[in-house]
């Protein structure tokens, strides 16, 4: 118990250390929330369209790195896909938290920024990153674009923008 008291005292005397720990925790929790919302929405949407479960989506995600032939023959690949999914969500979350204090307009209308960020995430994923993976280029279908972008706006953009806005608003007071 004495060691815990010293540790708390050290953090109180070292605001840089405390703020880095708090920021890291905020990024991790926000990334977990956004990633969970996103994979849940994608799974529900996929099930409603195909009748298939989340394993197919998670294998698809892993297939971006390993290729479909490897992914379909390995039972561990849905777990790999889930880990990859959360790594991507954490990356987009950390980037937003990094950009937020550097761009003054992000603090003004968090909900507009959330919509814009969700659309930006869709563009980065579907126009830049996915075509570079083993999945390759996919055909354009407006309905799929609208649904996918909508999911990313609601599940990634808005939650990240809202939570990071609250995080930084509390620190600037």
Language-model region placement:
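Alpha-helical transmembrane segments of multipass membrane proteins
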Residues: 33-42, 88, 92, 117, ...
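Hydrophobic cores of alpha-helical transmembrane segments in multi-pass inner/ER membrane proteins
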Residues: 2-3, 151-165
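N-terminal signal-anchor transmembrane alpha helix
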Residues: 18-51
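Short, Lys/Arg-rich, polar N-terminal cytosolic tail immediately upstream
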Residues: 1-20
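Interfacial helix-loop-helix junctions of multi-pass membrane proteins
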Residues: 127-147
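Hydrophobic alpha-helical transmembrane segments
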Residues: 79-97
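Extracytosolic (periplasmic/ER-lumenal) interhelical loops and adjacent juxtamembrane/interface segments
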Residues: 47, 51-78
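Internal alpha-helical transmembrane segments of multi-pass membrane proteins
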Residues: 102-123
